Amino acid sequence: MGSGPIDPKELLKGLDSFLNRDGEVKSVDGISKIFSLMKEARKMVSRCTYLNILLQTRSPEILVKFIDVGGYKLLNNWLTYSKTTNNIPLLQQILLTLQHLPLTVDHLKQNNTAKLVKQLSKSSEDEELRKLASVLVSDWMAVIRSQSSTQPAEKDKKKRKDEGKSRTTLPERPLTEVKAETRAEEAPEKKREKPKSLRTTAPSHAKFRSTGLELETPSLVPVKKNASTVVVSDKYNLKPIPLKRQSNVAAPGDATPPAEKKYKPLNTTPNATKEIKVKIIPPQPMEGLGFLDALNSAPVPGIKIKKKKKVLSPTAAKPSPFEGKTSTEPSTAKPSSPEPAPPSEAMEADRPGTPVPPVEVPELMDTASLEPGALDAKPVESPGDPNQLTRKGRKRKSVTWPEEGKLREYFYFELDETERVNVNKIKDFGEAAKREILSDRHAFETARRLSHDNMEEKVPWVCPRPLVLPSPLVTPGSNSQERYIQAEREKGILQELFLNKESPHEPDPEPYEPIPPKLIPLDEECSMDETPYVETLEPGGSGGSPDGAGGSKLPPVLANLMGSMGAGKGPQGPGAGGINVQEILTSIMGSPNSHPSEELLKQPDYSDKIKQMLVPHGLLGPGPIANGFPPGGPGGPKGMQHFPPGPGGPMPGPHGGPGGPVGPRLLGPPPPPRGGDPFWDGPGDPMRGGPMRGGPGPGPGPYHRGRGGRGGNEPPPPPPPFRGARGGRSGGGPPNGRGGPGGGMVGGGGHRPHEGPGGGMGNNSGHRPHEGPGGGMGSGHRPHEGPAGSMGGGGGHRPHEGPGGGISGGSGHRPHEGPGGGMGAGGGHRPHEGPGGSMGGSGGHRPHEGPGHGGPHGHRPHDVPGHRGHDHRGPPPHEHRGHDGPGHGGGGHRGHDGGHSHGGDMSNRPVCRHFMMKGNCRYENNCAFYHPGVNGPPLP
């Protein structure tokens, strides 16, 4: 039926057997069949057809059958569907059908049809539909009111009939009267008996505590009051319908006329608790009584009435009404012989239940904020009321409460989903908290997005389509006179030209040729304070220029040499007078512009050429100034000082050796001897005691100073605890040579000492020295002559010249210069350059790089300021043979003493140029030069 388009005429023809001529359903069976077809209907045409058939049907039996079969539920489904789809014609048809059906309150309670219709009456957009729905709602409200009012009326009629029957039969049949009474009052009595029995139990219980079981005996005697009690209860059953709140005081007043007076004011109490009382009272009556009476028998009932002091007096008299009641009520139960048993059973059944109430009654106490006495009264009275409440309460409920409840529901459903609501209005704290959480999450997500946003283009840019604009109808400024005035003005004014580009770029590079600075000759008087030194240890490294301006043109080596020569032109340099530095430089470099300094440095024999040219002038002796120390070459002339000596300052002797650094990390020239040293520096014999003397040295001099010497004004230190300043004697006199770079080499005891550059080896005790550069003659070996007159080492080896005249012995290896100027003489090993560290000549041993460290065995001499390095005694004599062992050169190396290393007044030294230019010196307190305010008084 629901597949293709439906023709209503065809549909009616198919249903013709069930319908009469007017389209009305003929029989009850026909409506069942039509209902089954309606369930299958999906199209709007067929549904409207069926609804019209129902509208034509007038028979209430058929319509009631339709509702009972399920037609009302089906219409509810159709109504819901059409409301969601907002199908207004179908909605109107359904509302008309609902209006036509004979619906009752029970039918309306089955589903939410009434609510839907109510919503349509309020919120429908179609005015006709709203009117129709409101009419239907008003009809249904009338049905509800009529039914709720008819029900209690019918019940009252039944009651009156029963009572009338019982009364009329009284004179005729006294026996039947009792039965009729009991039957007529069965329903109320049964309900009443339970509460009454409860009432009896409660006071009996209370009195049981006080007086015992006496209550039960008097209760059987006064039977006469039966009628009066029944009449009173009947009166209350009939008249006071809104007694639902009376439970508080109803029970005590049941038996006595004063109770009537109490009832009336209590009737005015609000009805809000009607339903609650009906629900709560049935389970509680016995529980409250037993528990509360047991707790408080007499005094508590006085407090029971609600916070009103006036009411205390009637409550005080209430125990007597209870007693009276207990007596009367059993009598009421007595006339019917078969019934007394059930009340007793109820009592017995309730009594065991009394322990339970303690749980529930306290709750009532808390909620009502009443003392137990008040509650005591409540449950006692409530049993009397529940009968009235249940019967009358239901009637009343059907009349009034459904309406109020509907109003409440209607108010709730007024907020329809289709209704416009202010969404942004915060309803409660929960909503506010939700919004807060959402806003926080949103803020966090945006922050995270922004933090990870690399500003990359996500959507490719698309060129917008060009807009084709129509030509303007009016040319702007066509009638303007100002443009002519401006044109005339521009004829007599220079045009403003802006030649620079619109978008700025980097400025054009300006070509320029660096002009070499002019070479200014050194001033001999001023050069004393400008002793340069070089940061790096490589021979090709850039050195500080002696004059700041002229040196920038020279290669570093020449700059160093110039500085050293300039520094050496002091009053104590006898051989320096006849040297013209400018001529030497010109001869070395050729014409100033012929070769750049870089090309000169790349020549392999460049440094050798310089040395060969400088040797005849006696300039080679100082050695490379690159390390800050102009070491005295082995053949250097004695008078060739390379620094202006201070008063009593130390002076390097000609006996070779770089003289050793004067302390840890100490740069600068070594101090000259004080007042000459006849032992080492004989007058007129520059080589005396030097490395060229192979014979035994002069007489023993056990306490000669180490190479470092003492500070300018220091007193000579006491002799060290170890024997001999140059190393321990091993069976002979002290060595007369200064072996090793700054360290005395043990020459005795069968050790074959290893000589450093310029170190003359003592040949005492028949020891054969190993010939280093400038060493003594080896046995049968013819030493080669090194520059500066020092003889090369033995064994046919031609030593290489270390720059500055220190010749390293050994197999053709060119030693590297340590900053102390001493050259390691080991087999080609490069000693580790610690500033001021004496380099061991060991074969393969790298001496420790501490300041003033000793020789091959790794012994660290004590670098106490002003003390000589002690002779750390090595292995026993004859254990090591020269280069053979791991500690070449014997075990008696001593380190440099710390003559000038720490403290002391350096004001008699030249001012440190580095300190004056940069404000600090990289050698800090170990610098050999004068730092004003640090190692001497500040400058004036």
From Swiss-Prot:
Domain TFIIS N-terminal: 73-147
Biased composition (Pro residues): 644-655
Listed InterPro entries: TFIIS/CRSP70_N_sub, TFIIS/LEDGF_dom_sf, TFIIS_N, Znf_CCCH, Znf_CCCH_sf
Keyword Protease: no
GO CC terms, sorted: chromatin; chromosome, telomeric region; nuclear body; PTW/PP1 phosphatase complex
Chain spans, region Interaction with TOX4: 1-348
CDD domains: TFIIS_I (cd00183)
Biased composition range(s): Low complexity: 325-336, 676-690
Subcellular location field: Nucleus; Chromosome
UniProt key word Metal-binding: yes
Pfam families assigned: Med26, zf-CCCH
Region (Interaction with WDR82) location: 418-619
Region (Necessary for interaction with PPP1CA): 357-433
Predominant place of localization: nucleus
Covalent link Glycyl lysine isopeptide (Lys-Gly) (interchain with G-Cter in SUMO2), residues: 179, 262
Modification Omega-N-methylarginine, positions: 665, 693, 738
PTM per Swiss-Prot/TrEMBL: Phosphorylated on Ser-398 by PKA within the region necessary for interaction with PPP1CA.
Family annotation (PANTHER family): SERINE/THREONINE-PROTEIN PHOSPHATASE 1 REGULATORY SUBUNIT 10-RELATED, SERINE_THREONINE-PROTEIN PHOSPHATASE 1 REGULATORY SUBUNIT 10
Stated role: Substrate-recognition component of the PNUTS-PP1 protein phosphatase complex, a protein phosphatase 1 (PP1) complex that promotes RNA polymerase II transcription pause-release, allowing transcription elongation. Promoter-proximal pausing by RNA polymerase II is a transcription halt following transcription initiation but prior to elongation, which acts as a checkpoint to control that transcripts are favorably configured for transcriptional elongation.
Subunit composition and interactions: Component of the PNUTS-PP1 complex (also named PTW/PP1 complex), composed of PPP1R10/PNUTS, TOX4, WDR82, and PPP1CA (or PPP1CB or PPP1CC).
Protein name, entry field: Serine/threonine-protein phosphatase 1 regulatory subunit 10
Organism: Pan troglodytes
Higher taxonomy: Eukaryota, Metazoa, Chordata, Craniata, Vertebrata
Gene, per the UniProt record: PPP1R10
